[in-house]
Amino acid sequence: VDQEGGRVQRFRSEFSELPALASIGELYDKDHDRGLALARDCGWLMAAELRSAGLDFSFAPVLDLRTAYSSIIGDRAFHALPGAVTRLARAYVAGMRDARMAAVGKHFPGHGCVTADSHVELPVDERDFYDIEQADLVPFRGMVESGIEGIMTAHVLYPKVDRHAAGYSKIWIEDVLRADMRFEGVVFSDDLSMAGAEAGGCYADRAQAALAAGCDILLICN
C-alpha cells in the first residue's frame, strides 16, 4: 500500500493523519534534530498502524528530490538536497524498523526532475547519467548502503542512458542498482497499469519486460 502521508495516504479512516514528507523537511531546515526526530516518529507511526491492521509493508519512503518541476512528486519528497533526503529517509526507515516493517524506497532512479505525471503519460528526463548520479541517485545509494529492503522503479524514460524506461531497463536495474550500487533486496515495478508503462505493450508483455529487466515483484493495481 502507499501510506506515505500527506496527499498519498490510502488508509485514512481510523488511521492517524500523517504529514507530507516535505513538511518534515521544512522542520529539518529549521532544526535538524527535531526534523530527524519527526521523520523517525512518522516512520514508526505509519508502520505500527499498518502492522496492527495486518499489512506487512508500505511503499515508503519516497527518495525522489523535491523540485519545482514535478507536481506529482512535489511535497511527497522530503527535500531538494540529496544529502538531506538521505538523512531524513534514514531516520524515517529507522522508525519503520522499530515497528518491524521493511522499507521500499521509490522511484528509482529519480522521478523528481520531470514535469509529466507517469500516471497519465511517460515522462522523459533528458539529463545524462552523470547529472542523475550526482543528484537523484545519491539518496538511493545512501539507503542501499543502509540496507533498505526494497526499491521501486520509476516509469520514466532517460534516453541518454537507455531507450527503455527505468522499470523495463536492464541498464538501470541490473547494471546500476544491482552491480554498481550492490543492492541485494527486492526490486518492485511501479504499477504496470499506469500510462507510463504502456510502452511495454499488453499487460502480459509489460510483465515479461519488467521481469526480464530485473524486477522481482510486479504491481498491477488498477
Regions found by a protein language model. Name each.
Residues 1-19, 39-65, 85-109:
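Glycine-rich, aromatic-flanked loop segments that form ligand/cofactor-binding clefts
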Residues 8-11, 24, 78, 122-125, ...:
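Short clusters of hydrophobic/aromatic residues that line enzyme substrate/ligand-binding pockets
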Residues 9-14, 69-72, 115-119, 162-165:
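Short acidic, glycine/serine/threonine-rich loops at helix termini
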Residues 15-33, 79:
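A charged helix-plus-loop insertion that forms the helical arch/lid used to bind
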Residues 27-34, 72-76, 120-127:
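Short coil/turn segments at secondary-structure junctions
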Residues 29-49, 80-88, 130-134:
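Glycine-rich anion/phosphate-binding loops
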Residues 62-75, 155-166:
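Glycine-rich, proline-tolerant flexible connector loops at the mouths of alpha/beta enzymes
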Residues 84-222:
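Second-shell residues forming the walls of enzyme active-site clefts
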